[in-house]
Amino acid sequence: MRSMKLSALLMGGIILFWGCGPKILLPPRVDLRPYGTLGMIELSSNAQGNLAPYTSQKILHSIQDAQPGTLVMELGTLQNALGSVGRSELDYEAIKAHGSKYGVGGIIMGNLEIDKVKPSINIASTLATINVSAYVEAFLSAKLVETKSGATVWSNGAQGRENVASVSLMGGEPVFNATDPDKAYGQLVQHLVGYLCNDFRSYYK
């Protein structure tokens, strides 16, 4: 019995030793340096207002925080980006044209989908528009496309559900127009962007 206890203690000590051993800092899963300057198209979204532009800026900040020195050229909305190269859709020719015109090696683009907006207060059916606090479900997806080949070299997605403020419902569609986005829906966006951009950060193993 005593020998069994000693064996158990010894095994526990070995596990504890390895668990508390030094961790190794590994490079990001996605290294952006080979692409030189990146282009970034503002997120498309089914939500009106400033949520998509706000989230796009948070993605930009997260990328440059993870890999300082990364150059990013903001190409505006999808409509503006297509118009700048005389294209009607974001196909290979449009991607290639952005690479030639702006000298970007890759373009980051994505979509922010808002679903199941559930107001936390009652809304009178006679009102067409009312500002509310609401629980929303959001799905953020993004990808990095190489301009030379048109191939997608990275993609990721994140999903979250939070109670956010300053949401308007117009015809049943969500509108986000907070004067202070950080306070109104910063927590939701921080969660989504943090998970989405994790591949750009160094990590311990």
Which stretches of residues belong to each language-model region?
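Short, P/G- and charge-enriched loop/turn segments at secondary-structure junctions
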Residues: I95-A97, S125-N131
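Short alpha-helix boundary/capping motifs
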Residues: D91-Y92, L127, A178
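N-terminal segment of the mature soluble domain
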Residues: T37, I41-K116, V145-T147, A151-S155, ...
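Sec-dependent bacterial lipoprotein signal peptides
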Residues: M1-C20
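Structural motif
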Residues: G12-I15, V30, G99
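C-terminal/domain-edge helix-coil "capping" segments
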Residues: C20-G36, K101-Y102, I114-V117, V132-K205
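Outer-membrane beta-barrel translocator domains and adjoining extracellular loop/strand segments
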Residues: I121-T126, L169
